[in-house]
Every structure is written in structure tokens, then in C-alpha cells.
Amino acid sequence: MVEIDQKFALSTPTGLGGNFPLKHDAPKGKHVCFVDNGNQYTELFRQGVKQATTALGWRLTVIQADQNVASSYGSAVTSSAQAGCDGVIMPSAQYANYQSQVPGAAKRGMVIVDANSSNKVGKGVVKVLSASKLQYYEGAATANVVLKHMAEHHPKGDVTIQTVMVPQFENVFKPILDGFKRQIAVGCGARCKVYTVNDDLSVATGPNPSAPFVAALQRNPETDYMIQSGVTDSGLVAALQQAGLKVPAIIGTAPLQSQLRDLQSSHPTTVAWVAQPFITYGWFMVDGLVRYWADDKPYDPWAHLPDVKWALYPSNVKDFVDGGQSAFPKGYQQLFESMWKI
């Protein structure tokens, strides 16, 4: 029997999950730096940050980092300080990669927003969208999508599941895996065997990104489910078919444009994707700075709320996708502007 914990059930994303007006008006004339490491998710975050800073009348400078070079994040903090930024948004980076630059930034009066990570950070750093909570919830919600599919297609017998870990982004992937594995254990018990494929970033972004998954399915050819991330899914189905392997049911998290297009095609190759509105996340990141500067006791009001996400299937994907990207909740810009009193 498959059990689904409703605590992690997905619901239609009609709002941000709360309404938290500022105590004081949002400040004017701020200069914000955004660290762009070239990752496809970061590019989407940047779009939201651009929208939000424009709405506030703030200046935005984009500072480049290299996701394959750990030291580039610290250099990005230094460059942000040299550019005269009042705040810098650092998405999905390991804290150790820029920790040594934090004291110098604080002395200059520059605050750092650590966004979308599970880092434990020190003074001078504001956490927004903590992956310890939000990505854990994402993993558990993804497990519920799997359990629902299992109830229909694998009501009895053992089930083999392959998941993915990208070591360079462990602070994001680990909470997802923790939430997923716990929820699968609760809902499926000993029936489900969960394995994890280590997909190094250099391979995931290289000429043969599917090699680790092909090898994993060669070891376990009867795999029933492959849990993917949008950034690791490139060319997976074609690679498995070319290797003569059975293509398992693919359920993923954080789809990018190629996965969303696939869901909308006449013959989708994946079952479902638990989607996050990454452009909206950029607004959350700017919200962290707004509250830091405007409120007497700044805090992240979103830290204890369920993440904004939805399970996208071929049957409903068109309801939640706008211009090739997940765009929800509807009117999110106006919701933030109302809280910011602009």
C-alpha cells in the first residue's frame, strides 16, 4: 500500500503564501549587485531581480562568477564592493566559497543576501529562500508525485528509484534528496530502493551529460523511476534509447524551458515536473534586501512557509507556463509592490 503524507501535498499556487507589509517605506536609491554564475537557474533569478529592482527604482549591476571555479564567488563579492554596491545577492553558492570576503563587505556597509542555499551563515549575511526548508519540501512533494504514480502503475512489488546529486550544488540538492528519501520511506517502506547518481557539474555541462545515468541504468536495468533536475536532464531519453536501455518513468524538479516544451509536446517523454517560478524567486531575493533596510528587525517571513510550486503534467502545464517559463502565482509583481508600498 502506498501512503501519501498530505503535509507535503501540492496545492494550486494562487498566492505567495502570505502577505507581510513593511513597517516603513522601501528605501530609495539603492545600488544592488547580483552574482551571475552562468547557471540556467541563476539566469532566471536575474530576470526577477531585474524586474524587482526596476520597480523599486534601484540600480542593478550584474557581477559574473564561474560555477566551476569556487574562488570566483569570493572575487564576485570583492568586485561588488569595488562597484559601490549597497547589497549583493549571492544565489545557490557554497558559503565557504565567499566567507573570507564577508568581514570586508560588512566593514564597507555592504550586506550579502545568501539565497536558495542550505548554508549556515555568519554576521553580515541575510538568508532568503532557505533550501534547508524549501528544497526539503520540494523533495518531499516530488516523492508524493512518485507515490501517486506508483499507486496507479506499481501497486505491488519492489520499486527501484534513481535520484541525482550534483556535488558542486550540494547545499541545494542535499535538502531535496533528504525530503525525497524520507517521504518515500514513509509512503513506500522497504518496497522502494533509492539510489543516488553523482553527477559532477563538469559532466552535467559537458559533451556527454547523460553518461552517469546511462551507467546507473546499466547497473540497474529494471529501474522504475528516474528523478531528475532540469539542469541534469539534457538528452537523457535519447541517450538511454541509444544504449538500448528501458526508459524509466522520469519525474523531475526545477524544469527548464526544454522540459516545459517537452511536457507541452504531442508525445512527452517525461511524466511530471515539480516546478518553481524562478523569476518570482528573484523578487523574493530583493525582498530580503528591502526588509533588511526598511524594517527595524528584518527577517525572512517566507522561511517557515511552504514553497510556491506546482506539479506540472501534460494535462495542466499550459495553465502555469507563460512564455516558456513557469509564471505563478498570477500577479506576483503587484503582490510584492503592495507589500513594499510602491
Task: Label each PLM-derived region with a short phrase.
Residues 100-137, 160, 257-265, 269:
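Flexible loop/hinge segments that line or gate small-molecule binding clefts
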Residues 54-67, 160-163, 184-207:
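Short beta-strand elements in bilobed, periplasmic/extracellular small-molecule ligand-binding domains
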